[in-house]
Every structure is written in C-alpha cells, then in structure tokens.
C-alpha cells in the first residue's frame, strides 16, 4: 500500500467515523512519517507487513528497493511509536549475497527485535521468478537461467531454475 493511498484511506475511515481494525503490506518508505503512522493507528491500523529483503544496504541497492537500512529503521521507529505491530519479510541466498552478509543480516534483524521495532519476521529462501527484474537482467546478478524445467521448489508456478557459477538453485531444502 503506497503511503498516499494509506493516507487517503485513513482520512476516509475517520471521516466516516468507522470503527475498524486493519493491516496492510507496505514498503518501509520514508513517506511513512510519525504523523502518518499516528493517523494510521487512529484509523484502526493494528499491523503492517513489509520486506526488509536481505537486510543489507549493498543488496537493497542492487535490488533497486529505494530504501536503506537506516531509512527503514526510521520508519520502523515511527510504527513503534504509533503502537503498530510490524512483521518483516526477509530472504536469504540472494544472488551475490555472502555468508558474512547473511550472518550480519541475522544480527541486525535480531537487534530490531530487541529494540521492539519488529514483532515478528520470516526468512524465505530466494526464488527467481519469471517476471522479476532479476530474471530480465540475470547477468547483473551473476546468474545464469537454466533451461526451463520443472523446479524442485515451486513458487506460484513461475519459479525459474538458475545457477551461480556451478551451483544450481535446485538444492534440497
């Protein structure tokens, strides 16, 4: 839910004097200011879910996510101050991600939890999907898309098998 849409929805809920509880998916965009988060809470928002992805600035930039860890953390603080529950989606095994970056991301996310900035999270293994920007520019991410074949792991029936060097994405979980 883009911040402008959220603002309009909240204003309409309040204008109509509706008594509702709701939650939505967001990007941890800087436009989620403390004032907007307070408005959301006043309009009945109890939770948001959003992607911190790999929780690493290098990878967020490579993914062209438009946020940094510092800017996302500022938004998380605004949600906390408004008493809005935050669930973060994360991923691991993103192309070019190192084991050291994974460990640092884990430490960082645990720190967000200790600070009360996120209340829950879930780590998903990276899946390359047909219509993703990564599938459109695989060389930018150091991957080779393998011939289309039935993937051992299927996500929305559009997952692509790929390899990084000689390592296939068809690993057993």
Name what the model sees in each region.
Residues 1-85:
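Conserved SAM/AdoMet-binding glycine-rich loop
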Residues 4, 58, 62-63, 92-100, ...:
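Flexible glycine/acidic-rich beta-alpha junction loops that bind and position SAM and/or redox cofactors
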Residues 13, 109-113, 173:
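Hydrophobic, Leu/Ile/Phe/Ala-enriched alpha-helical segments that form helix-helix packing faces
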Residues 24, 88-90, 123:
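Structural beta-sheet core signal
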Residues 35-37, 95-112:
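Catalytic cores of alpha/beta
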Residues 40-41, 66-67, 105-107, 139-140:
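Short, hinge-like loop/turn segments at secondary-structure boundaries
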Residues 50, 88, 109, 121:
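Hydrophobic, well-ordered secondary-structure elements that form the walls
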């Amino acid at each position: 839910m883009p911040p402008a849409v959220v603002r309009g929805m909240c204003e309409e809920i309040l204008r109509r004097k509706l008594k509702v509880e709701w939650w939505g998916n967001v990007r941890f965009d800087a436009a989620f200011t403390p004032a907007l988060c307070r408005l959301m809470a006043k309009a009945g928002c109890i939770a948001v879910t959003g992607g911190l992805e790999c929780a690493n600035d290098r990878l967020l930039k490579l993914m062209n996510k438009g946020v940094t860890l510092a800017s996302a953390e500022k938004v998380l603080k605004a949600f906390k101050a408004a008493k809005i529950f935050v669930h973060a989606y994360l991923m691991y095994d993103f192309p070019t991600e190192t084991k050291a970056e994974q460990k640092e991301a884990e430490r960082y996310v645990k720190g967000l939890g200790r600070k009360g900035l996120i209340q829950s999270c879930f780590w998903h293994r990276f899946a390359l999907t047909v219509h993703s920007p990564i599938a459109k520019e695989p060389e930018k991410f150091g991957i080779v898309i393998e011939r289309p074949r039935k993937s051992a792991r299927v996500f929305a029936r559009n997952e692509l098998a790929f390899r990084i060097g000689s390592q296939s994405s068809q690993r057993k979980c």
